[in-house]
Amino acid sequence: MKTVAQIVAQNDWQNPVVFQRNRVGGHSPHHGYKTLEDALHNANAQKYLLNGEWDFCLFDAPEQVPESLLAATLSAEERAKWQSIVVPSNWQLKGYDKPIYCNVKYPFPVNPPIVPSENPTGCYRTTFSVTSAQLSQRNHIVFEGVNSAFHLWCNGEYVGYSQDSRLPAEFDISNLLVEGENRLAAMVIRWSDGSYLEDQDMWWLSGIFRDVSLITKPRQHIQDVFVTPTLDACYRDATVSVRTSIKAQLRCKVGIQLFDGDTTVTEQIVTGTNNKRVDEKGGWDDVVFQTLEVKEPKHWTAETPYLYRIVVSLIDDSGNVIDREAYNVGFRNVEMKNGQLLVNGKAVLIRGVNRHEHHQVKGHAINEDDMLEDIKLLKQNNFNAVRTAHYPNHPRWYELCDEYGLYVVDEANIETHGMFPMGRLSRDPLWAGAYMARFTQMVERDKNHPSIIIWSLGNECGHGPTHDAMYGWAKSFDPSRPVQYEGGGADTTATDIIAPMYARVDTDVEDDAVPKWAIKKWLSLPGENRPVILCEYAHAMGNSLGSFDEYWKAFKDYPRLQGGFIWDWVDQGLTKHTDSGDAFWAYGGDFGDTDNDRQFCINGLLFPDRTPHPHLFEAKYCQQHLSFSLTEETDKWQLSVKSDYLFRHTDNELLRWQVLENGKPIIEGECPIYVAPQQAQTVSIAPEINFKAGALYHLNIDVVLANDCAWAKAGHVIDTAQLALANKSGLIPFVSTANVANENAESGVTVKAENTTLLVSVKNNVFSFNSESGLLTSWLHEDSEMLSAPLEDNFFRAPLDNDIGVSEVDNPDPNAWESRWRRAGIGKWDRICTSVDVEQSTFDVRITSLFEYHYNDKLIAATKWVYTINHQAALTVEVEVLLDDSLPPMPRIGLQAAVPAPRSNEQERMRVTWQGLGPFENYPDRKAAARFGEHSLSIADLQTHYIFPTDNGLRSDCKQLNISGLRVNGQFCFSVSEYGQVQLDTAKHTSDLMPQDCVFVYIDHAHMGVGGDDSWSPSTHKAFLIEEKCYRYSVTFCAKV
C-alpha cells in the first residue's frame, strides 16, 4: 500500500518522463453489450456512471494532503473540512480557487518541468457498489477528463497516475474491488509538467470535468477494434477491414456483422488463434484481421451522413457470445490527389470553425445537450467542419458529428505557445514520450469515427523531431487519413496540408518567426503542391469579420484553396454577478487573476449563451451552398439556382421569393427546388408588377426547409440572396413647382434674433441656433423638443477590439488604430466657431457656420455647415470637412445628434424604422449578408451588447431613417444607442453601461470597416479606410407627420 506521503514524494507531476502509472493503453471505447439488440441501438452498455455528488476538499499544495484522504471513515474533525461537489465540474466554478485566463503566457513562471509550490490540490472521495457478478469479471475505472494530473486510490490501495486533461485515464481495478461498497479517492493537482503542454488560449480550470464510469467486461474480452471502410476506385463497392484485439486465454472466435438499420448486410466468423499475422517478432495471437465485401453501400459525407453499424463478437467454442462491441461505420474515402483534399473523390471546401468546449456557467464540464445545441447551430449556419481546438473533445461529440454530418480535424492536446522558443519542448527528447502518448492515445480512441477526416499533431508548439515521429507513426498506423500541423510555418514535412494561421488573401504578413504568405502566394511557391486550408482565420473578436467575403471569393476561384476554420465558435465568457446581483460575462482579470490576457477569450461567432453575433450571419451567407443569378425576359424572370453541394440533392427545400418596391414587399411566391449536386436549375418567376417611376426594386430569395430535419425545423432559412431589379417604367418622376411660391408665402418662414439665439419659425416648428457656437441647439415641433443635444460633427468611434489590437492600458501598441487615433486626439478636439452667416431667400433660410478643430494648439480640421430650412420645415444640413494631412485614417466622418429617450409607454417612439441594409448590424466591410429593405426594430434591438463594449449597431447604405418622430433622408450609415461614445469607450463590461436620458443618433457619411483578418494588427482593408482629407455630404431632417 502506497501512502499519500509516498506518492507525493515521487513528485510525478514535475517529471516529464512520468505522465502515467498503471494506465491502460489507448483503445476504441468499450461498451460490453449483452445482446445484439443492445449493440445495434447503443443501449444498456455495461458502463456505470459514477457522476454525482462527491466529497471534496481543496488544499494549497499536494504536500498538505493528509493521509486521511484514504481512510475508510473520517473523524468528525476531518469530516468538517470536507464539502460536496458535483462531478463532473470545474472546482473554480464551484466556489474554490479562481479561474485564470491566458492566451499565450503561462500563469506561472516558465521553468519546465517545475511548477509553483503553491499548487491547489483538490481531493475527491466517493463510494460505489459492486455485485458479486461484477467481481467475477474485469472492471476498469475510466476518468474521461481530469485537469491537470491526478493520483488514484481504490479502497485505500494505490491505483495509478495520469496526465493529459482531455483523454481518458483508464485503470484496471479488478483486483482491488470487494463485494458491496467500495471507496475511490483522487488527488487532483492543478499544475503539473503536463500544464506546459496545455497552453491553449482558454480558461485554466481544474478538477474532474468529464464523466467517471466503471466499465465491466468479461475476463475474456474484446480489447480494441479498428474498423477501416474503403471504397473502390470507382467509389461504388467497398471493403471493411476490421482489426480486433482480444484478451483471451481460451480458444475463441471473432465474428463481425455489418448492419444497415436492423438488416444484416454481411457477416463473417473467424477463429481467432488460427488467424495469425507474422512479423519479425513472431505471430500476433491476440489480433484478428477480417475483411468484409460490401456491394454499393450508401456513402457517408458531411452532406449525407449515412451510417451503418458493425457488431464485433467474441465467441467461445460452444458458440456463446462472451463479449460484444459495436461501432458506427461510414463509407468514405479521404485522399490527397492533384494538390487537393478529396472526400469520396470530390474536392471538399471546408466551411469550418474552431470550437472550444465551453459553457458560460459550467466551464469545461459540458454535457450532451450542450454538444447537441452546438451541432445544430453549426448545421443551421452552413458549417460543415470543426477543428477540436486544441484537444480531443468529449467522446460523445464525435458520435454526434458522425450522426449529424460534420467533418472533424481531431487535434492532440499539445500546445506550448508560451515557451521561448515555442518549439523548445518539441526538440527535447525528455518530452517526446508525453507528446507521442497524447497523440497516439487520441488516435486509438477516436479512430473509428467517419467524421474524423484529418489528424492534427497539436497547435502552436513549433516544430521538432517529435512531430516528425508523430507524423510517421500516424501515416503507418492509419494511412487512410491525412495529417495536418501548423507549427513551424504551416508547411513543414510533418503536414500533408498547408495549414496557416491568419494568412491574408493577397497580402503577406511580416513575421519574425515564420513567413505568413498570402494564401494565393502559397499556391505558387516552387515545388509546392499541397492544398491550403487555414487552420485559423477570420478572428471573430467582438465586432469583427470584416472582408470575410474576400476569403470566400478566393476559395471559390482557386481549387487548391480549400477553405478554413474561423477562430472561433463561442465567446469564452463566464457568468459573474455584480455586487447588486446583475449578471454579466466575465473575462481575464475579473476573478482576481492578475496575470491575464483580458478579453482575448471573447472572440466567438456566438455569445456564451449561444445567441448569435451579427457577424455569424455574414459567415452563414458566405458559406451557403446555393448561388443565384437572374435573366430578365419580356414578361418573366429566369432565376438560375446553382448548387455547390458535392453529394446531396436539394430534396427538402422550398424557394421563396419576394419583390420589394422601395424596400417594401409587394408580391411573393414559392416553389420547390430539386437541384442535383454541382448542377443548376432554372426557376421561372412571372410577377405582375406595375413599375413606378423612380422606385427601387429588389428580388429577395430565401431557401427554406420544406420539412423538419435532424438539425432544424421546417421553415428554417438555409440560403438567402437579394438581386436588384431594373425598373421597367422608363420614366423619371415629375415634381411640380407651380405652387412653391404660394406655399412658401403661406408657410411664413421667419427669422428672429434674440441675443445670441437665432430663431427660425416655419409652420409648427421653431429652430434655435446659437450665433456664438454655430450649432442648432433646439428644435421644437408642435411645442415638443426634437433634440436633446445639438447636431455636431462626429469623427470618433468607441474602439473595437480590432482597433485596439494588442494594446495594454500601460503598454499601447503604437501601430494600433486606437493608439493612432488617441495620439491625434480624435474625440477630444477643441471646437471653435469662427463665423455664422444668415441668408434668407424667397423659399428658405440658410445659416452657414464655420468651425475649426484644434488639438495641442494645432489646427487639425475645419468644417463648414450649411443649414437650410425650407417652407416645408425640412432641415437640410450640408457639411464640408477638411482634415490635416498629419491625421491617420479616420474612424468615421459624420454627425451626431441626441433625441429624447422614449418613455416606457411610448411604444411607437421606441421603434426605429429605416430604409437601407439590415435587419442586423452591418458595416462597410461586412454587409454581404445584409439586404436592402424597410426594416423596423426597437432601440434596444438596434444595439449589439458586445461583452467588451465598443462601437456597435451600424446600418449601412441607408436612404431614410425614422426615430422618435424625426425623419432623416439622404445617403448615409447610421447607428442608435442608449449609451454615448464616451461611455462605450470607457466601459469594460456591459454591466458598466447605464442608459442615459437621451438616445444618441449617429449619421455617418463614411465609416471605417471593422477588419478581422486578425485582431492584433491593423487588418481593415485599404478599400474600407477613410484616408481622404476632404469630404462633402448632406442629409435632410424633418418632423415625421
From Swiss-Prot:
Residues involved in Mg(2+) 2 binding: 596
Q: Give the binding site residues for substrate.
A: 103, 201, 460, 536-539, 603, 1016
This entry's Gene Ontology molecular function terms read: beta-galactosidase activity; carbohydrate binding; magnesium ion binding
Cofactor binding, per record:
Binds 2 magnesium ions per monomer. Binds 1 sodium ion per monomer.
InterPro entries to which the protein is assigned, alphabetical: B-gal_small/dom_5, Bact_Beta-galactosidase, Beta-gal/glucu_dom_sf, Gal_mutarotase_sf_dom, Galactose-bd-like_sf, GH-type_carb-bd, Glyco_hydro_2, Glyco_hydro_2_AS
- What biological-process terms (Gene Ontology) are attached? lactose catabolic process
Q: Where is this site: Transition state stabilizer?
A: 356, 390
Pfam family of this protein, just one?
Answer: Glyco_hydro_2_C
Listed cofactors? Mg(2+); Na(+)
Name of the protein in its database record: Beta-galactosidase
Biological source species: Alteromonas mediterranea (strain DSM 17117 / CIP 110805 / LMG 28347 / Deep ecotype)
| Lineage of the organism | Bacteria, Pseudomonadati, Pseudomonadota, Gammaproteobacteria, Alteromonadales
